[in-house]
Amino acid sequence: NSSAASDVYKRQVKFHQYSPVRAVPFCQHYGVCGGCKWQVLPYSEQIRYKQKQVTDNLTRIGKVELPEISPILGSAKTEFYRNKLEFTFSNKRWLTAEEVRQNVVYEQMNAVGFHIPNAFDKVLAIEKCWLQDDISNRIRNAVRDYAYEHNYPFINLRTHEGMLRNMIVRTSTTGELMVILICKIEKDEEMALFKQLLQYVADTFPEITSLLYIINNKCNDTITDLDVHTFKGKDHIFEEMEGLRFKVGPKSFYQTNSEQAYTLYKVCLLYTSP
């Protein structure tokens, strides 16, 4: 319980009987990774509950009178629908409950994946993420394996020692692909080592349209104030929507579900048409 009398927090201890609408999570990282927390519900139930929550917040809690609310237009794709993901490197891999129970010392504690909720310096090693086209998984895992094999130092998110920091993958409906590797570089030999990694990525994945890199020697991960360098290809990719072409750069914002963005804009056009 929190200190506020109106707030109650609970955690599951035991299931006596599952709901008939309960779904089996399809991701091997479900329950540990902080994303996709509603995988135990079919997508149709997810959007139904989300609409109910918004309506309750406005009407029951906010006392706002609302007109009839149209149902949520769900995404046609519920897997591999994002066009952008950012992965984090860390020399402190999150150990699963099963690994902790084994009570052994693990030789490999580097990881690339997603931050663990409430543990900013630890990263869950991701083998397969269902959010983005599978090329994203293949690139991430290839970079990870190359870094393991050649002893690249992963960043320590507390002391800021190390080299490898982040990797961003952007895909598009045009088939173009952008990869951005972000590292901390303070010595010439580190830069040479970093460029070897970039060359490996370029050689292994010739389908990459835009291979970029950023040197970030700050304590935070923001890149908006940093220079972006082109290692191979263009400094941008293109996205298309209904005959319109959008130039997407490494710092650009574009709705992360490209197909659903078009659905949204069609609704806007419908409501604004005379």
Regions found by a protein language model. Name each.
Residues N1-A5, Y9, Y271-P274:
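Single conserved hydrophobic/aromatic residue that forms the stacking wall/gate
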Residues S6-H229, K266:
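SAM-dependent transferase fold signal centered on methyltransferase-like domains
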Residues K232-S273:
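SAM-dependent Rossmann-like transferase core, predominantly class I methyltransferases
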